[in-house]
Amino acid sequence: MIIKCIAVDDEPLALDIIKDYISQVPFLKLIKTFNDGISVLEYLASNNVDLIFLDIEMGGLSGTQLLKTLQKKPKVIMTTAYRNYAVDAFDLDVTDYLLKPFSFERFLKAVEKSCNSLNEAQNDHNQPKSDKDYFFVKSGYKILKVNFDDI
C-alpha cells in the first residue's frame, strides 16, 4: 500500500528533514510540500491525501486551526518544537506527535502507527455489512427475535 502524504512546515530546514525521511520509506509518496496552512486548505479542497506531516506554529493559520477546519481529516502526524500542544493535538485525533528534533527511528515509528491505522480503516471499510437488522436469542423454551434498534 502506497501512502500519499504532504508535509507542512514554515521552516525550510525542518521541511527538508521531513522530505529526506519520507524519501527513505518506500511506501510513502510525498505529493507536495507547503509552508502555510491556507495553501493546504486550498489543496485539500480538490485533492485527497492519506497522511499529513503538520507543524503547529506557523504564520497565519496554525496546524491546530487547520485541523479544526478540515471536514474530512486524513491521518496526521504533528511535527513541532513545542510540548505544550500535545494534549490539544491528540484531542484532534492526530496519529502521533513528533517533538523536534526527532530521529529517523522515531519518525518511522509514527509512520508505522499511521500505516496500521490506515490499514485498519481500509479493512473495516471492506468488511461486508450484514443485511440483517435483528438476531435471535434463546430464552427458556422460546426463541426470541430481537431488533438491533430495540437495544
Ranges and model annotations:
Residues 5, 30-31, 76:
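Hydrophobic/aromatic residues located in beta-strands of well-ordered beta-sheets
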Residues 13, 24, 37-125:
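CheY-like receiver
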Residues 112-151:
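Conserved binding/recognition cores within well-folded domains
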Residues 9, 29-35:
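Short beta-to-alpha connector loops in regulatory alpha/beta signaling domains
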Residues 27-30, 150:
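Glycine-centered tight turns that cap/initiate beta-strands
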Residues 18, 86, 151:
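Conserved RecA-like P-loop NTPase ATPase core
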Residues 2-13, 18, 22, 52:
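Conserved acidic segment of CheY-like receiver
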